[in-house]
Amino acid sequence: MRQTSVARLYEDQGPRLQLTHVSGPLDAVLSVAEERMWPADLVGHLNLIHPTRLQVLGAAELEWARRQSREKVAHHLNGILSARPPAIIVADGCETPNIVHGVCTAHNVALFSTPHPSASVIDQLRLYLSRQLAEKISLHGVFMDVLGIGVFITGNSGAGKSELALELISRGHGLVADDIVEFSRTAPTVLEGRCPELLKDFIEVRGLGILNIRTIFGETACRRKMRLRLVCHLERRQPGQDDPNRLPVQQEQQVILGVSTPRVTLPVAAGRNLAVLLEAAVRSTILQLRGVDSTQEFIDRQSRMLMGDGDGL
């Protein structure tokens, strides 16, 4: 179960949203127990159907409450707060009504106020929770920023991942993480990779030991995070192993946290410039993201030639 607390939310987002703690404990928990439930579902406008959400009251909700009888408003508020939502936030700079304060106190629910618009508060908290409570996984490899594309370099121990990363850094690309990469699924089709705090800025290269990339190459050689766009697997051929497919019609894919990501396999051999090959793979990926598929273009050209339409090349 992925979870965070109201206290942590208040600490992280309080200054940005100018949250004022009016009353109530901060020990309530926001948790995601089901994979099909996204963290962004944990916050929204005042809602009787989803009473367990973090509830945000804006000017529209308070205007509706003013037109109703006190008994009706109290009935609805008690119905919502009896489900123990993590907190109530009064937004739009509105003054907190006494009835809201009283019901929150009676049910021991945290109450906050903010001058920010309710829609802005919800958007900001949804973004925060989607990152804070995202599905996470740690994988072995090197994560790089190559030409603005997040590339995850994998391979067996001794395949040359760190050496390739060092070569790419010397060519002006950026390091995100070496050895262990933490991936988070921040949206249905988005994987974001970053480095554990302990390993940040460091890379380990056989024969050289541990190097501080930020100190050696400067601030621009390191990245805080990147979106994963390509997996590059380094494969050292074993005796008797078949040659890799030279003309793959279907692009290889790797699934991480349910998100499918393009993958290329680069055979490792003496004399092969893997940095150049990886840069070419990244440029090809950029073209594919724009709808340009070089392999399919070649197949189409060959088909036209076989059909006797060679003049149309």
Swiss-Prot record:
Residues engaged in binding ATP: 155-162
Domain of life: Bacteria
InterPro entries: HPr(Ser)_kin/Pase, Hpr_kin/Pase_C, Hpr_kin/Pase_Hpr_N, P-loop_NTPase, Ser_kin/Pase_Hpr-like_N_sf
Record flagged with keyword Nucleotide-binding: yes
Molecular function as annotated in GO: ATP binding; magnesium ion binding; phosphorelay sensor kinase activity; protein serine/threonine kinase activity; protein serine/threonine/tyrosine kinase activity
Reactions that this protein is recorded to catalyse: [HPr protein]-L-serine + ATP = [HPr protein]-O-phospho-L-serine + ADP + H(+); [HPr protein]-O-phospho-L-serine + phosphate + H(+) = [HPr protein]-L-serine + diphosphate
Keyword Metal-binding found: yes
Further remarks about this protein from its record: Both phosphorylation and phosphorolysis are carried out by the same active site and suggest a common mechanism for both reactions.
Family: Belongs to the HPrK/P family.
Domain notes: The Walker A ATP-binding motif also binds Pi and PPi.
Protein name: HPr kinase/phosphorylase
Species lineage: Bacteria, Pseudomonadati, Pseudomonadota, Betaproteobacteria, Rhodocyclales
